[in-house]
């Protein structure tokens, strides 16, 4: 506990415990003294208590604030604390000693702390003094006691300080320094009587100041004995202690004579004067004149004049070395000899007391000062300073020697002079209506002392502080010291407003203990002032008192709260800040014995009494009718004791020899004149006087202290004769008689035994009687009231208990919460019922309930002792216990055991079926079992479950590890795990999974062994299936790595084979490509391909085409495992393929004969009718649109423009499904296949394909080895040599053409150009007619990627359009594709001999040789399917040889292998065809044909790209340069639509005419074309589905390239130039073959479709036309100009 540290400094303050706080109700608050009497048993244990009034009780502040002026007291905080004041007194004496010695006291600092000289002195004295400590070397221990750490040389330092400062003072105190010097008769330890200090002439420092060194202390010297003027109040006239409550000794209320006042005044000395005095300088030696006059008072010699000192007080001389202790040097200041020092120090000190401040304050000015001080001190607003901080700082300051804080306290201000804070009806001020309640309230401190129950009401005089309240105006740190109230009365304090007041209280039973502790800790103060604690000037830290066993309690009194102190309860405290409080004393009936004890205590201390206690008792007894009954009873008791004591004292005095007696009315004698001279007690009943001094008297307790005269001369003065005392006692007794009777009856009733107990009704009557007669609420009254209350409570509880028991039996399942009695409470209740001082009727029934409870207890104990809980038995007991409305302790236990029993039943049921015992079930059972109360059966089951769970989890974890192990565990190790876990009676999923994995592993191994033991290798699909199934099996399969390696090798071989055969993004599988075709006759691609197979076969059957459905070879290979069967199936599919191809070729060739139904015949893979430019597949003989299939590419582009003779053969994408590698590549794949221990359907298909290809190769070689075919091959070789020569000539012509172009730019050679041009043109035409055809290749643009096309054909897909469009420039073919051509480009593919035909190159060469300069005109025809008369072929073969070659060619084309023999046979067969035979169709569309989307090209193609395309077309078709020269004359690119059957000369003439005519209209059309650009763009987007149709070549449509097709001019004289989305044309059937807009000639589309049209010119030539329908036209065409041409035109 905190207190004072070793060095005298205060440690941190620890607040004591809080005192009780009471909050009375309004009913309790109506009677203050009764309420205080009720709380007294509890509150008096702590000495103080706090009472909070009801919230609505708020009395107004009634003081006149403006006129309220007061002078406060000055308080130095560190002088209040007892131990601190002792230290300060010691330092004062020490400083005074050294000042008289001519030195200034300077307190040293040790280890950065001021040395506590007082503590050092006490510690050294306790250890035997300076010599003993030095001798025994205990200075280090002294340092430890002072709180210094050892080992730093502190001991020696302390020794030097003690020897220098304290040791001389110690010698002086012991009297050694005065040995040999004659001294007057002085007692250095003479005690000083306490002195009454005058306060009206003292000056004080300003409040709130702080000093950091030694504080200044004001001292007064006593000059005369205590005397003073008193008021004329008869009771206070002779008192020396003025009033009760927190007050200070010596504050005289009267005035003094001026002479006494002046005499008592003394000069104020200040403790720091000793430090601040300016000492006059003394010379080290005396002058020569004085040497003979002064000698040393010790040695009597005058030598050593330089060491001879002269006293400044008495002028005596002393040698420095004769002094004790000797002085080392001559003092510089004033020096006094030991005799003068002893005289000065022996003067009595003035008693300590508070000074009055100089300044007078109002409440406002004092509040401003107080608030400024607190806010400045704590450096924060006053309301924000915590009370705990102020409390700790206060106790730190009062214990601090270094800091001196001065505050002011407006204490003991009489409300009689300044007015009370409560409203009072004293006539000074008018009471407002709202103040009336508070003016009459018993809690008004002006009313409380004079209440009917109060003893002080019988004192007629206003005792200031006891009957008249005192006011207290406090500030921060202002305090009131430890004290008890006068006559040990009650006190009550009310805080009107302001900051809290902190209180500390000590109960009355520890009052003497507190006094002893303070005497022990500060004996110096009590030596001079024995009644120090009655002077309110000394405080001590509560922590110090608590350390010494004194109980201390605290509280913070806030505004509007009361604090009550009880008799002889020491209390002290301080203010937290600016506040205003009011206090007064009061005495109740229970105080009378305490007051009597207080007078006896005062008698021992010789302390004055405020009033005579005996007088008060007899005054109340003189008028008993006005006494309260309770007070009368107490007065009767006190009066009886006093009568007995007074009789004893008088008898003892008479026995001592006092003979004279005389009656005297003591109440008429002033109190100061009837005080006992020995004990100062105020005498009332009797006193002893002597004739030698009639004014002097003593009480009968001190008869011998009166005077030395004999007792016979002394006279006994008495107030009442002994004979009159019984009569007074009888009057009081009569008043209290009724009360005594009531007391006896109540006592008898409360103490009666069981058989003689009263009924509850009788006790109620006694209580009502006491309340009606207002008997005092003493212990008996409270006991009766408590007994009645207890009996009533027990009766109501018993009735409630019995009634609820019945209700509970009727509704035991009610869920409402009820408060039940426990068994112990029931037993105690039954015991209480039978121990009541009265009888209640329900006691017996409650006893029966207790018997039922005990029976339940016995049965429950038996049930709980069972080895295994029985759920049915437990349930029955629970039902029984629930019916009793008692809190049975066994009931929760029974419910627990019921839960245990049900849990055990569940465990037994679960374990009976191992399949239900999963880990989760066991965990749930364990979790539910963990929450159960402990039981050996449950614990046993829990242990079994836990063990089973642990084992199961361990095996489950082991199985899980095995399942997830990498690498996998072997079968044997897993089987051992499964076998070991088989005996566990639980459901283990991982173990079962492991078991299943073992089963799968066995099955898998068996399958592998079965496959490996077979005669043939397994198929890849089988091994892949085994690998896929074996891989997830969590068992180490020995054969799995081998199987996976085989699968990987087989897959690698299949991927390599696929790269060899398959095109990129091919829709065919490798097995389909390697197997004979089963989809012959099936068209389409993608996912619908297989679906269309069956649908097309059904359609072909409906058309009576003999196409036998073919099965899938792949399915046959998968179903067949025998090698021989595979070969047989392949042969069977091969035969079906050949038959199906024969049927398909026949069906496709038959389409060409269906001229009348040509619109219904479907061609191409798109399965649409014939239209535009079409190509015929050499294998299936079907025709394909050039926009649906990729066009064949010249092989010369791949081989650097070589003119090697190779054919251009077109195979459709359906017939040519793969890359067709060479046989050498296939043989390397077969070698790799032989190394694989795996069967692949693709491998077997490849073997069969290879055997088929080699077999065909053998047949082909045999056929080519015949004489007829050998000679044909030789003839072709000769023609090939001619082609090489022709290529050389063509190169020469190119050089000549280039030179001509250069010459055209030279003006000097312009005249010679026509001849050169005509000559060059003729040579070019002849050379082109004899040039060999270039070989063509093809690919499938729907299935091949750009990269694949580049790899296979040598051109990009971006160039496909140009390649396609190249075919449209053949003059002898029908073509509706367009190629834009600029006039600046050299074009060599127009108006030449047909070169893009399916002829062998040798036939072309032969044809050029056989043809003359002019070519016979083709036969005019309306249908492109009508055969023309052809020229003779190059080779002639026999029908048998040709048929054999055609059959070999068909079979060879079916093979997906490239063989040289197919090229040889193809060349021979091409040479057998006529040179002009068409293998490409150009169909003119009518409106009934399906329109195809228009491919619009933008203008973003560069000129270089266009030129490259045209050069490729030139290389592809080998056309002459004469056409290019003519085209160079044209300004814009042109597209020509050439009609089959017109001869070249006629076409050229018409073209020349058209060019001249169009040149003239060119400029006019440019403006119109520009205006129509945007309109044509929109119409082009809307009509993308429309197809471009062919226009007869005799029209020159060069102007159309510059304008819109819709604005083209027809042959009509007044052409309207129709501007529509679709322009319909009609051709004249009269012979001129001119073309006309249907709108311009007035022909509707229906007429043009059903009738022949003859123009006006032809009609004139033919004469009048007979009426009737015109012959139907051949074709009606719809034309739309391509967007690219339009852009170029614009």
UniProtKB/Swiss-Prot annotation:
Domain JmjC: 437-603
Annotated stretches, region: Interaction with LMO2: 1623-1690
Segments carrying motif GSGFP motif: 419-423
A cellular-component GO term for this protein: chromatin
Top-level class of the enzyme under EC nomenclature: oxidoreductase
Annotated site residue numbers, Breakpoint for translocation to form the NUP98-KDM5A fusion protein: 1485-1486
Residues that, per the record, bind Fe cation: 483, 485, 571
UniProt-recorded Gene Ontology molecular function terms: chromatin DNA binding; DNA binding; enzyme inhibitor activity; histone binding; histone demethylase activity; histone H3K4me/H3K4me2/H3K4me3 demethylase activity; transcription cis-regulatory region binding; transcription coactivator activity
Record domain JmjN: where: 19-60
Crosslink position(s): Glycyl lysine isopeptide (Lys-Gly) (interchain with G-Cter in SUMO2): 191, 1007
The ARID domain, residue ranges: 84-174
Described purpose of this protein according to its UniProt entry: Histone demethylase that specifically demethylates 'Lys-4' of histone H3, thereby playing a central role in histone code. Does not demethylate histone H3 'Lys-9', H3 'Lys-27', H3 'Lys-36', H3 'Lys-79' or H4 'Lys-20'. Demethylates trimethylated and dimethylated but not monomethylated H3 'Lys-4'. Regulates specific gene transcription through DNA-binding on 5'-CCGCCC-3' motif. May stimulate transcription mediated by nuclear receptors. Involved in transcriptional regulation of Hox proteins during cell differentiation. May participate in transcriptional repression of cytokines such as CXCL12.
Identification of the protein by name: Lysine-specific demethylase 5A
Record organism: Homo sapiens (Human)
Lineage: Eukaryota, Metazoa, Chordata, Craniata, Vertebrata
